Amino acid sequence: MKNPRDIIIRPLITEKSMDLAQENKYTFIVDKNANKIEIKNAIEELFKVKVEKVNTIRVKGKMKRVGRFVGRTPEYKKAIVKLRAGDKIELFEGV
């Protein structure tokens, strides 16, 4: 089994994710190879909360140019985690 800290890379704090936090849904950037069950277990172990549902999205890298050089931003996977009513992740509070 993978270490939960290897699965959950970092929280994704944007205006849209803060609106979702009001609905008890929290957004994280996760390992590209992690599945929903691994993400659920990692969140429950790290934050001591109960997860009801996990939605995942693979975000493609965007094309970027610097002068004549063309490259891409990295691809990543994000997970939107819905918690049981009454549970909170304090990391997102007060941002």
From Swiss-Prot:
The keyword Lipid metabolism does not apply. It holds the Pfam family Ribosomal_L23. GO terms for cellular component: ribonucleoprotein complex; ribosome. One of its GO terms (biological process) is translation. Keywords: Ribonucleoprotein, Ribosomal protein, RNA-binding, rRNA-binding. GO terms for molecular function: rRNA binding; structural constituent of ribosome. Part of the 50S ribosomal subunit. Contacts protein L29, and trigger factor when it is bound to the ribosome. NCBIfam families: PRK05738.1-3, PRK05738.2-4, PRK05738.3-2. Belongs to the universal ribosomal protein uL23 family. One of the early assembly proteins it binds 23S rRNA. One of the proteins that surrounds the polypeptide exit tunnel on the outside of the ribosome. Forms the main docking site for trigger factor binding to the ribosome. This is Large ribosomal subunit protein uL23.
